[in-house]
Design a protein with these regions (language model features):
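Polysaccharide-binding surfaces and accessory modules of carbohydrate-active proteins
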Residues: 1-169, 185
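Short Pro-Gly-centered flexible turn/kink motifs
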Residues: 8, 12, 17, 21, ...
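Short, hydrophobic/aromatic-enriched beta-strand segments in well-ordered soluble domains
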Residues: 42-46, 55-57, 68, 180, ...
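Terminal connector regions
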Residues: 60, 201-234, 241
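Short loop/turn motifs at secondary-structure junctions
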Residues: 66, 82, 198, 262-263, ...
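Conserved, mostly hydrophobic/aromatic
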Residues: 70, 193-194, 237, 267
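Short acidic, Pro/Gly- and aromatic-enriched capping/linker segments at domain boundaries
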Residues: 175-191
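Aromatic-lined carbohydrate-binding/catalytic grooves of carbohydrate-active enzymes
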Residues: 230-300
Length: 300
């Protein structure tokens, strides 16, 4: 917060004397290596208070993506700094009429595309929980372009599963600011002297080949970069599909022995092992082993 009032703030802080404005100035930059990719790290310092902000960018040319994240640091020695809002970053699109497509839904009806015209003002999508059907994925296209295999698409996603928000603000001149990160809902971050905090990453991308290429890009990026898909994973068996909530020690050991014989390397008891969990209406979140089902407890 600070500078032009027309820009949506990415960092909002309150200092000991209740000053709430930032005056961040460029101080230095460095180019680092993160695996096979380059990371640009730009240091901004406040002109009056001991707050340093690092804007970090990792370029992934193989996927036409840029990852961005922010680190804030209290470099003072005396006073705490209260962070009221800290997003992962933003990007701007030139003045035009744009349509936003994002995903919504509910249990059993996940990832339903929703498309809307972005008019002047702010369109916010957000989540206050951890459900998978609340996706931060977005795709921005010029109004009227709907071809799956051709046309401009600006796209991205926040790499975070907690409470989050994405803002799409169209200004009076038609320019579009896209920003996103942790949603500081009924919360704040207190930085003590010497303490720092790093936001989750947000990724941005662009293609001229429609939303089909967006799907392919994210599939490859998730598999090869986020999940490091080249690593060999163990063969897993999940007993949920055989027993549901009706589990007990003798039964699960018997299934595990059979699973081992066919080459399973990791056996998972998914649900029903904790107290009160006999159906999907109780017990969830009470992670105490039900000794009636597992008298000897559970351990790796």
């Amino acid at each position: 917060r600070g500078g032009g009032a027309w820009n949506g703030p990415v960092v909002e802080a309150v200092f000991k004397d209740n000053v709430r404005d930032l005056d961040l100035k460029y101080h230095s930059s460095e180019l680092l290596k993160d695996g096979e990719y380059d990371v640009l790290r730009i240091l901004l310092k406040d002109s009056y208070y001991p707050l340093s902000v690092y804007a970090c960018y990792r370029v992934l040319p193989d996927y036409n993506l840029i990852e961005k994240w922010i680190e804030v640091a209290n470099v003072g020695k005396r006073n705490d700094i209260l962070i009221e809002n800290l997003l992962s970053g933003s990007m701007w699109l030139p003045a035009s009429l744009y349509e936003l497509t994002h995903l919504s839904g509910s249990l059993g009806n996940e990832f339903q595309p929703q498309t809307t015209l972005l008019t002047q003002g702010v369109k916010t999508i957000q989540s206050r929980d951890f459900k998978s059907y609340g996706s931060s994925y977005f795709a921005i296209r010029p109004q009227g372009e709907h071809d799956e295999f051709a046309g401009n698409v600006w796209f991205g996603q926040l790499l975070y599963s907690g409470t989050w928000r994405m803002d799409f603000e169209r200004l009076s001149d038609g320019a579009l600011q896209i920003s996103g990160g942790i949603r500081f809902w009924d919360s704040w971050l207190n930085l003590t002297p010497g303490e720092s905090f790093v936001t989750p990453k947000i990724c941005f991308g662009y293609t001229q080949n429609g939303t089909s290429e967006v799907s392919q890009t994210f599939a490859s990026y998730t598999r090869e970069v986020l999940q490091q898909g080249s690593q060999q994973r163990p063969v897993i068996y999940n007993s949920w599909y055989a027993t549901g909530f009706d589990v007990n020690e003798e039964q699960q050991l018997a299934i595990a022995k059979v699973a081992k014989e066919i080459g399973v390397e990791m056996f998972v008891i998914d649900d029903g092992w904790f107290k009160g969990r006999v159906n999907d209406r109780g017990g969830l979140g009470d992670w105490t082993v039900d000794k009636n089902k597992f008298p000897n407890g559970l351990k790796p």
